[in-house]
Structures are given as structure tokens and as C-alpha cells.
């Protein structure tokens, strides 16, 4: 009986802890960012990242901010259109996040262009978005002052500036 109660308590405590933005998330270009895929439902996002998120009040789209601690900047932003993920991107410059071929947040611009392949550069307010489109998905590598600041996924042929 004690073992069953202990197991129940551990499961109760561990479940919410597992649902949070990843500390060292991964970009799979054209597919996922931090385990989130375009088209997922809001319920799937909450199951993966938890219920602790801020809501952007001034954004055109419904936007949730999953940060590591309340009112901090680093984490993951998720935009929803009709309760489905239409964009997902890192917030601020979360350490430990990576993309294939050893590309990590903080890499210099030349590493991004070498490792991510041919990219289209768009100028945003205060940063640049180096992008690559597939048929359905655009992958963005956000550059600030010559360094990789973050990653993003959104529908192909949309504005990557956020």
C-alpha cells in the first residue's frame, strides 16, 4: 500500500514538471522547434509545454510565451491561428538550443550560412532573419549583431519578423 501511494505521489509531482519549455531545445528545420510542430492544437502545446505561459496582449495573433521563470525573457513563443500552431520561435537568446550540424545559439553569422545552407536574408527591426522555405514551412535563423540569437518555424512565404 505504501508503495502504491508513493508511486501515485511521484507521478503527480513528476507530470507537471515534465511539461515545460525544454532547457536545451532543438530545431529540426522545416519540422519542429523544441518539440512543437506547426499545425498542432493548443491542447497538444499545453500537454508538451505545460499551462504556465503568458499571453501577449498587443499581438495580432494569439501568442503564448513559455518562459523558464515568470516574467523572464528566455523561452519559447507559440502563435496560434484557429487553435493551431501557426508559428513557433525562441524568445530572447536561450542558451543550449541547437540545430543540426552543431549549430548552437550564439554561433557567428558565417557558421549559420555555412551549416544551414543557402538562406534568404530579410531585415527586421533590430535583427535579421535568415530563412529557408520548404513547400509548407519556413525555417528562420535570427541574427543580432552578427550572432545567432534564435530560431523560428512558421508557414512558408510568411513574414518571419516578430
PLM features: residue spans?
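Functional surface patches built around histidine and acidic residues
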Residues: 88-90
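Positively charged n-region of N-terminal signal peptides that target proteins for export
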Residues: 1-4
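N-terminal signal peptide c-region/cleavage motif recognized by signal peptidases
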Residues: 14-15
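Cleaved targeting-peptide boundary
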Residues: 20-27
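Second-shell loop/turn segments in exported
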Residues: 29-36, 96-103
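Short, 15-30-residue, compositionally biased linear elements
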Residues: 26, 92-93
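A cross-family detector of function-defining hotspots
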Residues: 21, 40-84, 93, 103-162
Amino acid at each position: 500500500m505504501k508503495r502504491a501511494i508513493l508511486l501515485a505521489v511521484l507521478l503527480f509531482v513528476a507530470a507537471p514538471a515534465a511539461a515545460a519549455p525544454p532547457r536545451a531545445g532543438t530545431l529540426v528545420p522545416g519540422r519542429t522547434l523544441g518539440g512543437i510542430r506547426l499545425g498542432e492544437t493548443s491542447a497538444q502545446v499545453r500537454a508538451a509545454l505545460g499551462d504556465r505561459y503568458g499571453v501577449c496582449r498587443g499581438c495580432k495573433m494569439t501568442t503564448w510565451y513559455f518562459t523558464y521563470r515568470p516574467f523572464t525573457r528566455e523561452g519559447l513563443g507559440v502563435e496560434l491561428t484557429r487553435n493551431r500552431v501557426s508559428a513557433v520561435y525562441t524568445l530572447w537568446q536561450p542558451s543550449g538550443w541547437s540545430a543540426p550540424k552543431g549549430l548552437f545559439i550564439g554561433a557567428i553569422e558565417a557558421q549559420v550560412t555555412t551549416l544551414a545552407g543557402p538562406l534568404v536574408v530579410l531585415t527586421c527591426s533590430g535583427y535579421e532573419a535568415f530563412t529557408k522555405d520548404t513547400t509548407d514551412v519556413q525555417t528562420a535563423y535570427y541574427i543580432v549583431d552578427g550572432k545567432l540569437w534564435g530560431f523560428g518555424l512558421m508557414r512558408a512565404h510568411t513574414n518571419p519578423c516578430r
